[in-house]
């Protein structure tokens, strides 16, 4: 694997080791929500094309830093905290709106909780594209929050099968392989105008809707009576246990 770590270990914001790099692909898992990143020299930096990031949170600095280093047809995949999809504090909402309106946000994926050993903060994936080759004016939303499998009391994982499913969904949406179709509760392709109508919030759950469930023919009154009886039984059992 070819690599270039730069001339020296340094702060990538204030002492950028790759100022002229314009990459075809970028993958990044920057630290979430870091608050001590700002330096006065970053005011008006050319990387902040969509707005100056808040000085107390680097999430939108990372997003714009990656976009700045993409080539004309480059793509980036970035892991960030879930809050980045909806935060409106200190200019973040305005930056996100500018990015959406510029059509550089391609795919948003909400991940299951407890994927990381070192943090319980829920995470998401941002897929950015300098110039979309397929589906301009749309964003693909995937809600994978319920697709994790617990491998211990405190740790979840995405199985290879689920990863393949997500990858196939993105590929189909891009027109690379297979046919794409919206799936309630899982994925939906959304026009930029609809996203703007939601205040440019990028949380997938807001757009994909609820998963379709099989209906049944049981009348509501009968179902309510059955549930009430079960509740009474559980309350009685609880009282009996409390009396022991």
Regions found by a protein language model. Give the residues of each.
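Conserved SAM-binding strand-loop segment of SAM-dependent methyltransferases
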Residues: 2-10
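A conserved structural/catalytic subdomain of Rossmann-like adenosyl-cofactor enzymes
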Residues: 12-244
